[in-house]
């Protein structure tokens, strides 16, 4: 997901350090005990939700024109002399490496300083971590998922194992005292996956196999083992989008529709629009996700929350957002994009089963997202919010179910009907904060308060960068490993230090993308 600008405002407000920002909740925990169970009505609490930028901005294109553009995205039909006539599997990964993408921090730098570097490094959404300031060898990374893990510890949502209680208390107390916390100190709570590196002379077939297996980024190294670039799933997909005319095996896939290709998953985790933002952050951490769909009680997709949106929570003034609803946070995101950066907030985080692969890839590249939500025809939403769902909801019972495919042309596909869509909606109850966050209890914004809230449709699936690159790999005769192994590994390392994941409320199918 694209991070607007270089976040100068966050850098300039260094007097409100991340440690000081997050420590406020620890002080309030000692004063307040538990969050009050009494909840005021929507009418009392949300008379004035943040205005949408649409209310005072006139987009340069009409909504219909934007939709038409997304339905028929332009593709570069002119062969690039650099790649014309070449087999993409023989292109060196070093040709795609960009030296400016490599930003460093070291283990002895504070989380606050590392966060400021991360906010400025929007191309890769990651900062490389090294042992010393002069080293060129990475030993880890620091990204928004790591920032999320740190935030959850400091605000009191984390439940450590017995042997880590002392460490968690130390981190929280240091933040409360506004004492810088070094990256070295928080490494045990991050439980990072092993870094994967490729020499610059390695070819793209190795990168596509790795990405199609669920690896999110690769380090590009020179002959001395020093990092000279970072290749991400998104960067590689962007390359295939722009240069597809040079590679017929890839280019011919773009005209196929998702339903025929049978890529993606029909089992999805989502969050309720009326649930607190803290629940969404906890869910993403527990499940090893970088983004999650926000749905109403009719399972209509209302928006998308990403770990990259944590950039909006790094100042003291914004910390109370953790207790406000996911819908309210979406309105904040829209305002930040539309007002501060002049971007039209037209929602583009979804596709439908009859969208072409070209349409889907165009949206992934344009929004810099890790996944697109697959939706069916929009359905009415109940006027009064019901109790958030805890168990899997079979869309065949409570919502429209997509018709089974009758003809399949995709790689690894079959003529048998696919599994019925299942959406697991996070509950507010089990993941409520153990300690109160600053200020009073903040309510949710009614889902109907945002213009265009129901234009997407009912959630029925998800297509990720991994899915698309896995398709490219198999179409080219490569044999990527099962992506579910990587996803399960990320989730196990994440959920071990916070709270139980949603395994008890779903089947055995792994669907983290």
Swiss-Prot record:
Disordered: annotated segments: 1-62, 400-449, 474-513
Q: Which domain of life is it from?
A: Eukaryota
Give TM segment ranges.
Answer: none
Q: Which GO terms describe its cellular component?
A: cytoplasm; nucleus
Q: Which GO BP terms apply?
A: cellular response to glucose starvation; regulation of mitotic metaphase/anaphase transition
Q: Where is the composition biased (Low complexity)?
A: 9-25, 400-423
- Keywords from the UniProt entry: CBS domain, Cytoplasm, Nucleus, Repeat
Q: Which Gene3D superfamilies match?
A: CBS-domain
CBS domain location is: 190-249, 264-321
Q: Name one Pfam family in it.
A: CBS
Q: Can you say where in the cell this protein is located?
A: Cytoplasm; Nucleus
Bias (Polar residues) ranges: 424-447
The record's listing under InterPro entries reads:
AMPK_gamma/SDS23_families, CBS_dom, CBS_dom_sf, Ssd23
Q: Name one GO molecular function term.
A: protein serine/threonine phosphatase inhibitor activity
Protein purpose: Involved in DNA replication and cell separation.
Family per record:
Belongs to the SDS23 family.
Cross-referenced PANTHER family:
AMP-ACTIVATED PROTEIN KINASE, GAMMA REGULATORY SUBUNIT (PTHR13780), CBS DOMAIN-CONTAINING PROTEIN (PTHR13780:SF36)
What's the protein called, per UniProt?
Protein SDS23
Species annotation? Podospora anserina
């Amino acid at each position: 997901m694209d991070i607007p600008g270089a976040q100068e405002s966050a850098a300039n407000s260094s007097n409100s350090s991340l440690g000081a920002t997050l420590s406020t909740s620890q002080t309030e925990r000692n004063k307040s005990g538990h969050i009050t169970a009494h909840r005021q009505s929507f009418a009392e609490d949300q008379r004035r939700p943040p205005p949408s930028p649409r209310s005072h901005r006139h987009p340069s294109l009409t909504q219909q024109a934007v939709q038409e553009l997304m339905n028929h995205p332009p593709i570069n039909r002119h062969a690039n002399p650099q790649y014309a006539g070449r087999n993409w599997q023989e292109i060196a990964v070093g040709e795609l490496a960009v030296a400016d993408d490599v930003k460093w921090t070291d283990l002895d730098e504070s989380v606050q300083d590392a966060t400021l570097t991360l906010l400025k490094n929007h191309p890769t959404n990651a900062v490389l971590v090294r042992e010393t300031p002069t080293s060129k060898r990475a030993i880890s990374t620091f990204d928004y998922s790591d920032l999320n893990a740190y935030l959850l510890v400091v605000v009191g949502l984390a439940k450590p194992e017995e042997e880590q209680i002392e460490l968690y208390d130390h981190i929280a107390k240091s933040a409360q005292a506004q004492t810088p916390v070094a990256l070295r100190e928080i490494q045990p709570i991050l439980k990072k996956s092993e870094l994967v590196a490729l020499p610059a002379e390695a070819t793209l077939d190795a990168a596509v196999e790795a990405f199609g297996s669920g690896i999110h980024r690769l380090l590009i190294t020179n002959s001395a083992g020093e990092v000279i670039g970072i290749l991400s799933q998104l960067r590689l997909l962007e390359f295939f989008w722009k240069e597809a005319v040079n590679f017929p095996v890839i280019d011919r896939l773009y005209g196929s529709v998702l339903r025929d290709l049978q890529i993606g998953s029909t089992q999805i985790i989502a969050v309720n629009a009326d649930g607190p933002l803290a629940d969404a952050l906890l869910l993403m951490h527990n499940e090893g996700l970088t983004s999650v769909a926000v749905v109403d009680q009719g399972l209509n997709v209302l928006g998308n929350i990403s770990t990259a949106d944590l950039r909006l929570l790094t100042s003291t003034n914004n910390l109370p957002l953790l207790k406000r609803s996911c819908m309210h946070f979406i309105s904040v995101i829209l305002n930040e994009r539309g007002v501060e950066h002049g971007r039209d907030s037209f929602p583009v985080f979804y596709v439908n089963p009859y969208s072409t692969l070209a349409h889907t890839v165009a949206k992934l590249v344009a929004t810099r997202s890790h996944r697109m939500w697959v939706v069916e025809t929009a359905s009415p939403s109940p006027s009064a919010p019901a109790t958030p769902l805890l168990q899997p909801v079979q869309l065949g019972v409570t919502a429209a179910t997509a018709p089974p495919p009758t003809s399949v042309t995709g790689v690894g596909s079959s003529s048998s009907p696919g599994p019925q869509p299942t959406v697991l909606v996070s509950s507010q109850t089990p993941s409520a904060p153990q300690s109160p966050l600053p200020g009073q209890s903040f309510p949710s914004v009614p889902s109907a308060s945002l213009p265009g809230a129901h234009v997407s449709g009912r959630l029925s699936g998800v297509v990720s960068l991994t899915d698309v690159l896995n398709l490219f790999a198999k179409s080219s005769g490569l044999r990527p490993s099962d992506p579910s192994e990587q996803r399960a590994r990320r989730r196990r390392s994440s959920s071990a230090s916070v709270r139980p994941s949603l395994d008890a409320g779903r089947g055995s199918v792994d669907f983290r993308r």
